[in-house]
Amino acid sequence: MAKTKAEHVHEVFESISDNYDKMNGVISFQMHIGWRNDTMKHMAVKPGSKALDVCCGTADWTIALAEAVGESGEVKGLDFSQNMLKVGEKKVQPYPQIELIHGNAMELPFPDDTFDYVTIGFGLRNVPDYLQVLKEMHRVVKPGGMVVCLETSQSEIPGYRQLFRFYFKYIMPIFGKIFAKSYKEYSWLQESANDFPGMKKLAALFEQAGLEKVTYKAYSGGAAAMHIGFKKIR
């Protein structure tokens, strides 16, 4: 019987967890760090806030959020891969304000209106239903709170999109084989990036999820993009 997307994604991330951080740097040529830093500048996270990092993986963005909210704040990181969380647990030890949770982005285990900020970084493309996850993020963020996605995107620059797809389809899996001995897993990850909607379509999904004042910004010619939306104040 064919595996569901969720089952396949789970197997992929359980398999690549030990080399995930190293491969992120290799694949993006370290640009993902700058993308995240710029996104954090746009967020302007306030000390003492409560934040949730969905599909937190090995907790890089979770840690950035913890540094922004400070010890008086609170950060939850949620992921469905136990192996990714094991790597993350070692990294978050210096941050008592962080709690990592094993859970499903499609059904977030939190009450409505809980967090000031809800983020998802390079995880939305891997979920079974983009809109359902965005709706869940909208549900758990407080009125006036911010939902943020940093993800691969589809460039609108002529020729660049083709170059980007060539890199993801042919070069990235080779890097996966060389540096992580995971050609098959990184071949699948390029498919998820290729299938992911462009900036305008993702902005429309943000609005369908109930978010307002939706804005987005392209990085590196559209190789990635940041989207920000707010929950309406009742």
UniProtKB/Swiss-Prot annotation:
Pathway field: Quinol/quinone metabolism; menaquinone biosynthesis; menaquinol from 1,4-dihydroxy-2-naphthoate: step 2/2
Catalytic activity field: a 2-demethylmenaquinol + S-adenosyl-L-methionine = a menaquinol + S-adenosyl-L-homocysteine + H(+)
Keyword Magnesium: no
Enzyme nomenclature, EC number: 2.1.1.163
Binding locations of S-adenosyl-L-methionine: 58, 79, 104-105
Enzymatic class: transferase
GO molecular function, one term: demethylmenaquinone methyltransferase activity
Biological function: Methyltransferase required for the conversion of demethylmenaquinol (DMKH2) to menaquinol (MKH2).
PANTHER family for the chain: 2-METHOXY-6-POLYPRENYL-1,4-BENZOQUINOL METHYLASE, MITOCHONDRIAL, METHYLTRANSFERASE
Protein name, as recorded: Demethylmenaquinone methyltransferase
Phylogenetic placement of the source organism: Bacteria, Bacillati, Bacillota, Bacilli, Bacillales
